[in-house]
Curated annotation (Swiss-Prot):
<keyword id="KW-0926">Vacuole</keyword>
<feature type="signal peptide">
    <location>
        <begin position="1"/>
        <end position="23"/>
    </location>
</feature>
<comment type="similarity">
    <text>Belongs to the protease inhibitor I3 (leguminous Kunitz-type inhibitor) family.</text>
</comment>
<dbReference type="GO" id="GO:0005773">
    <property type="term" value="C:vacuole"/>
</dbReference>
<dbReference type="InterPro" id="IPR002160">
    <property type="entry name" value="Prot_inh_Kunz-lg"/>
</dbReference>
<dbReference type="GO" id="GO:0045735">
    <property type="term" value="F:nutrient reservoir activity"/>
</dbReference>
<comment type="function">
    <text>Major tuberous root protein.</text>
</comment>
<dbReference type="GO" id="GO:0004866">
    <property type="term" value="F:endopeptidase inhibitor activity"/>
</dbReference>
<dbReference type="Pfam" id="PF00197">
    <property type="entry name" value="Kunitz_legume"/>
</dbReference>
<keyword id="KW-0758">Storage protein</keyword>
<keyword id="KW-0732">Signal</keyword>
<dbReference type="InterPro" id="IPR011065">
    <property type="entry name" value="Kunitz_inhibitor_STI-like_sf"/>
</dbReference>
<protein>
    <recommendedName>
        <fullName>Sporamin A</fullName>
    </recommendedName>
</protein>
């Protein structure tokens, strides 16, 4: 347990240091180690229950007291008619918005979400008719920040379905999110990016992953 705490502390400390990967000339970060399909195991929520395919859950920052809660859909770009920005709530006690997790490969027999397999994510929140489909996750390069940001929008094949949930600590049910380039076995960590202009914490491709736990709607 002490070793895990030290490892998480070091990861968080490294994240807070100046990061050369944040250069606007390098939107794609260091690839993670490719994990074979044989490592597939069910994703578990904080209660130890299997995460159901197509179910609604909260994805919450795993490190308590680090000024981070759940993931939310925010409207940071006033030039966009729909909210499209994925942020980390600054409130540790805020679970964020509900998120639907669905296997990217349609399988009527799939009842649970598996690690190291492709998944799609979408916010399950009320929107107006114009934005009803603009809730699917994808990666989009932002020239202003020089980051490849996690954004919400319409479902885009070969982008919206390229995410994987990977195990960080099986005992604590800690996970990280990776994004894999279509047609490649290279995957990239999705981590926190502190936007200095908007003074908010967003998610982007990064060296240092965003550790999270999955909370059911009823704990």
């Amino acid at each position: 347990m002490k070793a895990l705490t030290l490892a998480l502390f070091l990861a968080l400390s490294l994240y807070l240091l100046p990061n050369p990967a944040h250069s606007r000339f390098n939107p794609i970060r260091l690839p993670t180690t490719h994990e074979p399909a044989s490592s597939e195991t069910p994703v578990l929520d904080i209660n130890g229950d299997e995460v159901r395919a197509g179910g609604n859950y909260y994805m919450v920052y795993a490190i308590l007291g680090a000024c981070g809660g759940g993931l939310r859909l925010a409207h940071l770009d006033l030039m966009n008619n729909c909210a499209s920005d994925v942020i980390v709530s600054p409130n540790d006690l805020d679970n964020g918005d509900l998120i639907t997790i669905t296997p990217a490969t349609v399988d009527p027999e799939a009842t649970v979400v598996m690690t190291s397999t492709y998944q799609t994510f979408r916010f399950n929140i009320a929107t107006n008719k114009l934005c009803v489909n603009n809730v699917n996750w994808g990666i989009q390069y932002d020239s202003a920040s020089g980051q490849s940001l996690l954004k919400a929008g319409e479902f885009v094949s070969d982008n919206s379905n390229q995410f994987k949930i990977e195990v960080v600590d099986a005992n604590l049910n800690f996970y990280k999110l990776t994004y894999c380039l279509f047609g490649s076995d290279k995957c990239y960590n999705v981590g926190r990016f502190k936007d200095p202009m908007l003074r908010t914490t967003r998610l982007a491709l990064s060296y240092y992953p965003f550790f999270f736990v999955i909370k059911p709607t009823v704990v």
